[in-house]
């Protein structure tokens, strides 16, 4: 549909689920081999020429190996480059094991001015996030999974530009903010809490550090007890973002449910349960914090 779109691959076309694109549009695909820094450099050059390049690979390889290039050659120059970091978190890195699970990427990218961060909650939302990223100017980082995550959204639901979608509105005992592929678990936890007489609001945050957090602030104002759940290190992810908004706008208690250690190899769903992301564990943490 657009002649300006380019896909830049550091030997990661399969990981990005972009093999059909490379085969159908060979003139819009550049293979750089296992050279993440080079891939970002190439993308920066293409963006300087007016094209819209997408660079994708495992999120840790992208944000750690090419950190300087993402910062200086794209962020500092505010170039129109889009990044897709796949296999994010415990739920995204099942097949390759602990060396390919990454839960620090949001902390890294959130330190770069000019970047917008998209955190889709399921494969369909990832598709719509890519479409939206192509239509906005400036650097965008999309935190993607493996394509094996639980479907929550309707497949035709657009990626919310407001940065938030409220899924459950049971009450104001607490607000549960979800981020990424734990959304189905957070919604199940909200249902469990309702059965126990604790009425919460549950929402999906799909844009971090966006330019207009007004809709997020409205939902934050529903309760003085805010909980964040994200498949990321406890530092620099959703918890840090909501804490910042609370400190700067409307103080409230923020309880962060996130990773505090490195992960381990194993089936993604079992790991998520083991590291505190089961609906039962989330609900128990809310009950404990509320003293109920």
Regions found by a protein language model. Give the residues of each.
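Thiamine diphosphate
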Residues: 1-143, 145-292
């Amino acid at each position: 549909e657009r002649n300006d779109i380019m896909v830049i691959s550091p030997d990661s076309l399969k990981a990005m689920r972009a093999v059909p694109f490379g085969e159908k549009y060979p003139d819009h695909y550049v293979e750089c081999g296992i050279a993440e820094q080079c891939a970002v450099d190439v993308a920066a050059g293409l963006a300087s020429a007016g094209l819209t390049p997408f660079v994708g690979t495992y999120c840790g390889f992208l944000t750690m190996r090419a950190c300087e290039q993402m910062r200086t050659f794209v962020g500092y120059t505010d170039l129109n480059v889009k990044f897709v970091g796949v296999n994010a978190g415990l739920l995204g890195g099942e097949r390759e094991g602990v060396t390919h699970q990454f839960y620090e990427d949001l902390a890294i990218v959130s330190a770069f001015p000019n970047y917008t961060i998209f955190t889709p909650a399921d494969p369909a939302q990832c598709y719509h996030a890519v479409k939206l990223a192509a239509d906005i100017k400036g650097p965008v980082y999309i935190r993607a999974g493996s394509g094996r995550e639980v479907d929550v959204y309707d497949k035709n639901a657009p990626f919310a530009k407001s940065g938030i979608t409220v899924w459950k509105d049971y009450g104001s005992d607490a607000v549960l903010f979800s981020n990424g592929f734990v959304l189905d678990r957070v919604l199940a936890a909200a249902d469990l809490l309702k059965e126990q007489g604790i009425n919460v609001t549950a929402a999906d945050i799909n844009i971090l550090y966006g330019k207009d957090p007004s809709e997020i602030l409205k939902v934050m104002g529903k309760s003085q007890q805010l909980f964040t759940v994200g498949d990321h290190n406890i530092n620099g992810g959703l918890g840090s973002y909501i804490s910042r908004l609370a400190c700067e706008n409307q103080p409230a208690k923020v309880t962060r449910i996130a990773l505090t250690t490195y992960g381990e190899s194993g089936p993604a769903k079992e790991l998520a349960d083991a590291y505190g992301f089961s609906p039962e564990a989330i609900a128990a943490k809310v009950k404990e914090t509320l003293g109920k």
